[in-house]
């Protein structure tokens, strides 16, 4: 089965950056998606590139509007099928790295989970 790839910008320099990593880890632990190394993609790693070529879906998850994950993916030749920006999509103000609200993790997980659903994509439910 082809992987559902998550490209996550988890720099940990803000609460929304930290949130991207926490939510992605939860989905990876549940076997719902695979987190790909964004730095390896930026460095042109052939293994990461091959796996992304074979991925069923690619979702970029960024914390803030700088959209580093999406931009790195696009520059590497892998435009994501969906691009999420947690600060925008969940209405969370960017703040210090440790200021992640416990209530925000399940909200982020659900947003990413919906973006990964092939059915939602086919029906045009995910913008």
Give the residues covered by each predicted segment:
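Iron-sulfur-associated redox domains of electron-transfer enzymes in respiratory
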Residues: 1-127
């Amino acid at each position: 089965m082809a992987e559902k790839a998550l490209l996550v910008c988890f720099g940990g320099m803000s609460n929304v950056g930290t949130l991207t990593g926490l939510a992605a880890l939860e989905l990876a632990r549940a076997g719902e998606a695979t987190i790909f190394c964004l730095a390896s993609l930026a460095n042109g790693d052939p293994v990461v590139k091959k796996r992304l070529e074979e991925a069923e879906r690619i979702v970029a998850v960024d914390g803030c509007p700088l959209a580093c994950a999406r931009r790195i993916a696009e520059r590497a030749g892998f435009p994501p099928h969906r691009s999420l920006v947690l600060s925008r999509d969940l209405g969370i103000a960017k703040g210090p790295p440790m200021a992640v609200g416990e209530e925000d993790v399940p909200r982020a997980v659900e947003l990413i989970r919906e973006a990964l659903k092939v059915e939602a994509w086919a029906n045009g439910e995910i913008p």
